A protein has these predicted regions:
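N-terminal secretory signal peptides that target proteins for export/translocation
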Residues: 1-5, 41-42
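Glycine-rich repeat segments that build the extracellular carbohydrate-interaction surface of secreted
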Residues: 75, 84-101, 111-116
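Low-complexity, acidic Ser/Thr/Pro-rich repeat tracts that form intrinsically disordered stalk/linker regions
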Residues: 24-87
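Sec-dependent N-terminal signal peptides of Gram-positive bacterial secreted proteins and lipoproteins
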Residues: 4-26
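Extracellular beta-strand-rich solenoid/capping regions of secreted or surface-exposed proteins
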Residues: 100-112, 120-149, 153-165, 171, ...
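All-beta strand scaffolds that present successive hydrophobic residues in beta-strands
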Residues: 112-115, 136-141, 174, 198-206, ...
Length: 264
């Protein structure tokens, strides 16, 4: 009888230990403080090793999903950036690398774009970003040390004035994240076209963007369809070497608002 009791309590103790070990990753996931997945020291063919590999696979899946679950997404391609802007569960988008786009990025919700020291370059002939009437975009830059070089004597094709162009052999250095290349032959808002929405610039630089008419860097427009006026709040960052017939840096259309606290 005593031996049976001993076996019973031993089995109960083992079960408790197993349950405790299994529950640890779940508890960590709930608190958002995942640690590195445990590794198995058993042989590759053992049941314990298979179980450990399955647990590691589950945790790796949690790691991959965690940034989106927290509302943060890192992107490294144009497609990833476009998809992230369309995903309302993502509130902060961080560039992991330089990204080239060929069509305008549209913002129609509240979202933050962290340039993270990288270059967002338009290779087409339109605005880099359009903030629509329902859009509220914040541009920030957590990495202000990465350096990019520009040629400051690129002649803008329509007005033949100096405009900065990204150039690995350029003489001008811009530190931190950069939005560049926008505009081409389009009329307004080469860097960012704010069509009734709100743009807050807290960091980064808009460099070498152009427009045939107004707002080489940023153009603030009134959206007649919604009755909303464009708003630009600048609390940091820079607009450099942009070109347009009117407002090479920023053009403010009637009924729109530009408030500048800091920045250049």
């Amino acid at each position: 009888m005593k031996k049976q009791k001993i076996r019973f309590y031993a089995a109960l103790l083992c079960s408790s230990m197993v349950l405790s070990l299994v529950s640890m990753p779940v508890s960590a996931a709930e608190t958002g403080q995942l640690t590195n997945p445990p590794t198995s020291t058993e042989g590759p063919g053992s049941p314990e090793s298979a179980s450990g590999n399955e647990a590691a696979a589950v945790l790796n899946g949690l790691y991959a999903a965690l940034p989106v679950a927290n509302g943060v997404k890192e992107v490294a391609t144009a497609d990833e950036l476009t998809d992230a802007l369309a995903d309302s569960s993502i509130s902060i988008i961080t560039l992991k690398d330089d990204v080239e786009i060929s069509s305008t990025l549209t913002v129609n919700r509240t979202v933050t774009l962290d340039l993270n020291g990288n270059v967002l370059k338009m290779t087409g002939s339109d605005s880099v970003i359009k903030v629509e009437a329902d859009g509220d975009l914040t541009i920030q830059d957590r990495n202000t040390t990465t350096q990019h070089t520009f040629n400051p004597h690129c002649k803008y094709q329509f007005w033949y004035i100096d405009m900065w162009e990204l150039d690995k052999d350029g003489s001008k250095i811009v530190s931190g994240g950069v939005i560049t290349g926008g505009g081409g032959d389009q009329n307004n808002g080469g860097g960012v076209l704010v069509a009734g929405g709100t743009l807050t610039m807290a960091g980064g630089s808009i460099v070498g963007c152009s427009a045939r008419s107004r707002g080489g860097g940023v153009y603030l427009a009134y959206d007649s369809a919604t009755g909303k006026s464009g708003t630009f709040i600048m609390t940091g960052g820079s607009i450099i070497g942009c070109a347009a017939q009117l407002g090479g840096g920023v053009y403010v259309a009637p009924e729109c608002t530009f408030a500048m606290a800091t920045g250049s």
